[in-house]
């Protein structure tokens, strides 16, 4: 490989891995992709690169591993920065803190509520759906009239973090019986705008493939444990 050796360890449905790949693609950084079977036999490379958490994604840059998706995105933004390269986080300390705040909020709220729309049933599922819709409404208000969360010209880390969940929307909507567009139409416009960017559209996993995998998991769970 070239002097800049960049390797990404990932599991294809992961929203956390997707944002790392999008960050690299947005900055036009060449990298080698290595798929990990996180539910099967984890590779020695993953266990050596992330011995504490043993999780994906991992970015290996010139032999040095960087772990945790948002930390990786910030690392990418700091290492590959010049006048020609998109900046994913602002240089102003306050604006940067706000970017981190929203990225962290998305991972805490969207991930948890979305997951419970298909792992829970009855009242708990309804509560999860409402929480999911409410956090999307909060994010829609934060977006306001901007094209992207990062402004009108380019995406930011917040955009990459939130759009990384989009491939899961189909699963959550179908199983939960609701429509994101019915509740947050402007946010869906933002999603469509993001998907016009090649770096984003080619980096996201297939929503139907995710749905198939989730339904398989549900069937296995029902067979062994019931619901």
Curated annotation (Swiss-Prot):
Residues engaged in binding glutathione: 14-15, 41-42, 55-56, 68-69
Enzyme Commission identifier(s): 2.5.1.18
Keyword set, alphabetical order: Cytoplasm, Detoxification, Transferase
Gene Ontology MF terms in the entry: glutathione transferase activity
InterPro entries: Glutathione-S-Trfase_C-like, Glutathione-S-Trfase_C_sf, Glutathione_S-Trfase, Glutathione_S-Trfase_N, GST_C_Tau, Omega/Tau-like, Thioredoxin-like_sf
Record's function text: May be involved in the conjugation of reduced glutathione to a wide number of exogenous and endogenous hydrophobic electrophiles and have a detoxification role against certain herbicides.
Subcellular location: Cytoplasm, Cytosol
Family: Belongs to the GST superfamily. Tau family.
Annotated GST N-terminal domain residues: 4-84
UniProt-recorded name of the protein: Glutathione S-transferase U27
Keyword Signal carried by entry: no
Single GO biological process annotation from the record: glutathione metabolic process
Cellular component GO terms, alphabetical: cytoplasm; cytosol
Enzyme class per UniProt: transferase
